[in-house]
A protein has these predicted regions:
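Flexible "cap/lid" loop of the alpha/beta hydrolase fold
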Residues: 79-86, 152-171
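A conserved short beta-strand
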Residues: 143-155
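Active-site signature of alpha/beta-hydrolase-fold catalytic machinery across serine-
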Residues: 54, 136-140
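Short beta-strand/loop motif that positions the catalytic acidic residue
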Residues: 171-174, 178
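Serine-hydrolase catalytic machinery in alpha/beta-hydrolase-like enzymes
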Residues: 15-119
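C-terminal catalytic histidine-bearing segment of alpha/beta-hydrolase fold enzymes
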Residues: 171, 183-227
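Alpha/beta-hydrolase-fold catalytic nucleophile elbow
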Residues: 71, 125, 149-152, 173
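Gly/Ala-rich beta-loop-alpha elbow adjacent to hydrolase catalytic centers
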Residues: 125-130, 134
Length: 227
């Protein structure tokens, strides 16, 4: 990178440094005292951990799961200025952000397992931008993933180049009027998975870029089979 000042060229170099920050996550304990599986949620862009957790609690049967909602590290104020929301990453320093996020997820899940009675079963559930994090955590996280729920978000391109990934069962959901996760994007994801002999479950429903009761019921059945 260079800038021109007084007819002279000034060279500017870009660097990165590893920094420590604190992440935030919410836990909804199960209704039972016995060890339970973990359902880990990743919210969409401009949302927060509370928003995603509220959706997870509405899924039938999740009272028998430990619910864990992780908030993205990049916080900012909502347009109204009344709420603190987050995103997972931007295109800037993308590879470093992916590494940081996967390490963050590893630490959160590990901390929860150390302090709560859980089984070995972990399912990652993402909405919108959070879908990419669910896929990445499943593919490269330290904790074995037993299922992925992907609502209204696509598979990150870098994972398509890694044929060594052992994918767990996958449920992909899309609203028929969703203008962000289009039918073409869903078809592209399914085409990729079919090319590696993975056949995700799918749920199409009459709505847009959102959670619905129909989809939550489908997730409930998916989780029942995994548990």
């Amino acid at each position: 990178m260079a800038i021109i000042k007084n007819n002279s060229t000034i060279s500017i170099s870009t660097h990165t440094v590893k920094a420590t920050t604190h992440g935030r996550y919410l836990i909804r304990r199960p209704s039972t005292s016995v060890a339970t599986p973990i359902l880990v949620g990743f919210h969409g862009y401009g949302e927060h951990a509370e928003r995603l957790l509220s959706e997870l609690t509405l899924i039938p049967g999740t009272d028998e799961w430990l619910l864990l909602s992780i908030q993205g590290l990049h916080r900012f104020y909502s347009k109204s200025g009344r709420h603190v929301v987050s995103s997972w990453m931007t295109r800037q320093d993308r590879d470093s952000a992916i590494t940081d996020n996967v390490a963050y997820i590893n630490d959160v899940v590990g901390a929860v397992r150390e302090t709560h009675a859980t089984t070995s079963t972990v399912v990652y559930c993402g909405f919108s931008q959070g879908v990419a994090m669910a896929y990445r955590a499943a593919a490269h996280g330290n904790h074995r993933c037993h299922g992925i729920v992907a609502l209204a978000g696509d598979l990150p391109p870098e994972l398509q180049d890694d044929r060594g990934i052992k994918w767990p069962p996958i449920l992909i959901g899309r609203g028929n009027t969703d203008e962000w996760y289009t039918q073409d994007k869903m078809n592209a994801d399914l085409t990729f998975f079919h090319s590696i002999n993975i056949k995700p479950e799918t749920c199409r429903f009459n709505a847009g870029h959102e959670w619905t009761e129909d989809f939550r019921n489908h997730v409930s059945q998916f989780l029942r089979h995994i548990r």
